[in-house]
Amino acid sequence: MTDIILKKADPEDVPAIVAVERKMAGSGTCYAITAEEEWKKEMGNSVVYVIIKDGKIIGDAAFEVKSKDHIYGSGLMIDPEYQNQGIGREVLTRFVKELKGVKRIDMTVHPHNSAAIGLYLRFGFVIESWKDNYYGDGQPRIIMAKCQ
C-alpha cells in the first residue's frame, strides 16, 4: 500500500481532522478531539501528520517526543470508511522505520479497540499496564510499548 501520503499537519488541516475525529467519537473505542481549538493546542504539543488518500484527509497520526530515546504515540485515527484496508499498518510501518533510533515507543489504546491492539502486537508492542480514566473521559486505556 503506497497510495497514501503522510503530510505534517498545518492549521488549515484542522477542520478535516476534526471531521474524522467526530466520526470516530461515537465508537467508544478512542479518545477523539472534536473541537478545532483543542486540535490547534494539540498541534503545539505534538507532531501531527495527516493521512491523505486520493487527495482527501482520511486520518491523522500524532506523537510526542518525550526525549531523544522515547516517543509517545498520542494518536492514530483512520476514517471508518477507510479502515480494514491496511492503512493503519502502512502508517505504523512508516513511523516505526522513521523512528528506528528511538529506544522506546509508547501507545495508548482503548481495551475494546481489538483491531488497534492486534496491529500494535504484530509490530512488537507489548501490553504494559491498564489505566482507569486515562484521559478523564471515564474510560480505561491499555498502555502498550515497543522497545527497540
Task: List each model region and its residues.
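Conserved N-terminal entry element of GNAT/NAT acetyltransferase domains
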Residues: 1-12, 148
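Acetyl-CoA-dependent GNAT
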Residues: 8-14, 18-81, 92-94, 98
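Short, well-ordered beta-strand micro-motif
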Residues: 50-52, 143-147
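Conserved glycine-rich acetyl-CoA-binding loop
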Residues: 56, 79-93, 102, 110-118, ...
